[in-house]
Amino acid sequence: MSQSVPSFQIEPVSKAQDQFIQQKIDLKTKPPGALGLLEPLALQIARIQGPQQLQIVNPTMLVFAGDHGIAAEGVSIAPSEVTRQMVQNFAHGGAAINVFCRQLGFNLEVIDCGILTPVEGVEGIIDQRLGAGTGAIHLEPAMSLACVDKGFAMAQALIERHHQAGCNLVAFGEMGIGNTSSAAAIMAAIMQLDVADCVGRGTGISSETLERKQMLIELALLLHQSAMTGPKQVLACLGGFEIVQMTGAMLAAAERKMLVVVDGFIATAAALVAVTINAHVRDYLIFAHRSEEQGHQRMLEHLKAKPLLSLGLRLGEGTGAALALPLIQAAVNFYNQMASFSDAGIEAVV
């Protein structure tokens, strides 16, 4: 049965209540701006949810996994088999993201978008496979345009299921050996940058491997230059199955007015594509952290994003997005619970 191509009807947030919301924030018992980035974060959430009581319900971490053909060229410190091994580790609860999700109260779901060999007989892995690893992007397209559409449809259904269960915050993580190469290529294509400005060391490759990685991405961009006529075509030529489904899920979550928490370099590349498809997605994105990956800061600046954390993370998995949840909850709580100057009988500091 053929899947229909999803279209996303995303409304921009209303700024009609901005003055009321900002005044409510400013009249809390503190000097204006004293809570730093938590204040614009509270404003953003109030724009999305309305200016009365804010809330986070059933926060959910989605970790999308997929393998990359370019990984066979040795662009990572680890072979592609590690993607499958880490997916098993997620399912058994032993990875960093499992630990953080248990600590912080996230529901965790792991999605196999297309690792080389599926994990059999293990509960807790959602099968949304688009293939057994992408094409090697320096030699051929990563996938077909029809595959991108199928991935978007799967992601839309996934988000709808969580939305129906009452979830209003979804965080995005990933796992895929070679996916920093795909993300850097996407960044270079969409932002029209030199590859050297986008490519980093990923999980910690040598200078020699870094040069090879850069060369392969340059070959990929040259090979697909004429075919990359829009953001979906960029995904088809350069993307990963997990990046495609993250992009579709971000679009679907924004359509449903959910809070979208973006992790590191790869998740931000998916966000870049989503915003290029529909600029209104940006209103719903909360950027968790600035990673160690060279190029991430430039992408964040392009998206006018001020990440909440800078911890030197370079793991992926959604770890930074998980660690940002207490700060997002703190923004909600101060907005809802903190006394105003008049409530407390204190002379306003303005």
Curated annotation (Swiss-Prot):
Reactions that this protein is recorded to catalyse = 5,6-dimethylbenzimidazole + nicotinate beta-D-ribonucleotide = alpha-ribazole 5'-phosphate + nicotinate + H(+)
Q: Where is the active site?
A: E317
Q: Which Pfam families match?
A: DBI_PRT
Tell me which UniProt keywords the record has, alphabetically.
Cobalamin biosynthesis, Glycosyltransferase, Transferase
Q: Any idea which GO molecular function terms this record carries? A: nicotinate-nucleotide-dimethylbenzimidazole phosphoribosyltransferase activity
In short, the EC number is: 2.4.2.21
Root EC class? transferase
Is Transcription regulation there in the keyword field? no
What pathway is it annotated to?
Nucleoside biosynthesis; alpha-ribazole biosynthesis; alpha-ribazole from 5,6-dimethylbenzimidazole: step 1/2
Question: What is one GO biological process annotated to this record?
Answer: cobalamin biosynthetic process
Recorded superkingdom: Bacteria
What is the purpose of this protein? Catalyzes the synthesis of alpha-ribazole-5'-phosphate from nicotinate mononucleotide (NAMN) and 5,6-dimethylbenzimidazole (DMB).
HAMAP family in alphabetical order: CobT
- Entry similarity comment: Belongs to the CobT family.
This chain belongs to the protein called: Nicotinate-nucleotide--dimethylbenzimidazole phosphoribosyltransferase
Q: What lineage does the source organism belong to?
A: Bacteria, Pseudomonadati, Pseudomonadota, Gammaproteobacteria, Alteromonadales
